[in-house]
From Swiss-Prot:
Pathway given in the UniProt record: Purine metabolism; IMP biosynthesis via de novo pathway; 5-formamido-1-(5-phospho-D-ribosyl)imidazole-4-carboxamide from 5-amino-1-(5-phospho-D-ribosyl)imidazole-4-carboxamide (10-formyl THF route): step 1/1; Purine metabolism; IMP biosynthesis via de novo pathway; IMP from 5-formamido-1-(5-phospho-D-ribosyl)imidazole-4-carboxamide: step 1/1
Pfam families per record: AICARFT_IMPCHas, MGS
GO terms under biological process: 'de novo' IMP biosynthetic process
Lineage, highest ranks first: Bacteria, Bacillati, Cyanobacteriota, Cyanophyceae, Oscillatoriophycideae
Residue stretches making up the MGS-like domain: 1-146
UniProt key word tRNA-binding: no
Superkingdom of the source species: Bacteria
Descriptive protein name: Bifunctional purine biosynthesis protein PurH
InterPro entries xref list: AICAR_Tfase_dup_dom_sf, Cytidine_deaminase-like, MGS-like_dom, MGS-like_dom_sf, PurH-like
Catalytic activity: (6R)-10-formyltetrahydrofolate + 5-amino-1-(5-phospho-beta-D-ribosyl)imidazole-4-carboxamide = 5-formamido-1-(5-phospho-D-ribosyl)imidazole-4-carboxamide + (6S)-5,6,7,8-tetrahydrofolate; IMP + H2O = 5-formamido-1-(5-phospho-D-ribosyl)imidazole-4-carboxamide
Amino acid sequence: MTRLALLSVSDKTGIIDLAQQLIHQFDFELISSGGTAKALQAAGLPVTKVSEYTGSPEILGGRVKTLHPRIHGGILGRRDLPQDTQDMETHQIHPIDLVVVNLYPFEQTIANPNVTVAEAIENIDIGGPTLLRAAAKNYAHVTVLSNPKYYDTYLQELAENNGEVSLEFRQKMAGETFALTNSYDGAIANYFMTLSSENESTLPSRFTVSGTQFQSLRYGENPHQQAAWYQTGTQPSGWAAATQLQGKELSYNNLVDLEAARRIIAEFNPQEPAVAILKHTNPCGVAVGNTLADAYEKAFNADSISAFGGIIALNQPLDKETASLLTKTFLECVVAPGCDDEAKEILTAKSKVRVLVLPDLMNGPKQTIKVIAGGLLVQASDDVIDTPDSWKIVTEKQPTLQQLAELLFAWKVAKHVKSNAIVVTKNRTTLGIGAGQMNRVGSVKIALEQAGEAAMGGCLASDGFFPFDDSVRTAAAAGIKVIVQPGGSVKDKDSIAAANELGLVMMLTGIRHFLH
């Protein structure tokens, strides 16, 4: 008995070859609609248009093509259920064994910043998801192919099973299809949520996130943990759009560290050279310099021991002078918005170092997500831009312009250090970083110990308020002259009084930057 296949695709990759083999090798007849039918006819292949098969023309400018009982009955009919087979015979519905459908490019459409709502709406597929879901639901009898990458595997299944398809394959394709339609509907829902929200940061009552596996990773944080890298959206963006110039395959930990490095370096104006060196998502050296090479040397020397095996982020294209410095130590990854040819040549001497070019270092996700038992925690990303103009001077002593610049630098770095976070800086270079301690004065002591005598005359930034005046007194004893912190403690007055007593400058930002 001749079998029917329904082909209706937006992405026509591989569709002609698939159709040819279905007809000539496996005795299929083809039903198709719209542009797919035209493409098959242009290739000289016999095809019945959906409108001819159903007896109903395409209407509403093509909005209604396949929504018909002869189509959906043929897909949904259960071949092992007498009542279904009787209904199909009564209504002259032929079983459809194969459904090949992919969807209108909605996500690509809305990726265009100039797209109108009307254009977006016309790229919401209705018939396609309906066909896919029907075929996936009836996978016991129907094969559904929702992506060209499955065509060859399907043909191989037919060849190896005397023209049949294994239940295991049909079930797998059903799962892939429901994942696709879920992702597609999620993208549409998120688009409408954005349209209806007065404030883009407002979180919806329903939150949908989905991704397509971009790359399998060797393992996760540890070798016993499985891991994979998923791309959100249909077009590569962010790290998926980066170019890796050399080095080994990126690991899970590399990607986590690279994103942390990107977030830090995005704080600094690309007109002014800046470099950040990280280990385990915490900065160990950050600096602004006269040149990129100068900034790197300052950041490296801030903690040369921790920089070994580190992740380097630069806010300007990598040049030969900086590349030469990078080859002097072992590094895991380097990312920059560009890399000149001389720098590329120099870096080949360290061929295992992963070197990436990510032109758009400044833009990242607008939300952060954490998975907890039974749910997700979603928050707006900590992208607030706070500058000394909005801060409050709370001490008798006033900061100089140079000190204001130093305070801002230290504050930007502290924002990206695990809480409790303390950062000691001078000349817009980190000298000591206290990260992740359970009490704030503990982080103060670590940062000051690391800075040593260089802390004299320096700046100290704290991501959270001081609960007591002990941190201020400890900082002053090490020679710190200016402090920036959020404020908000019930004992702020004690810290301010200590700062006045010890002749320090203190500014309160009014904004906290916890990072967990």
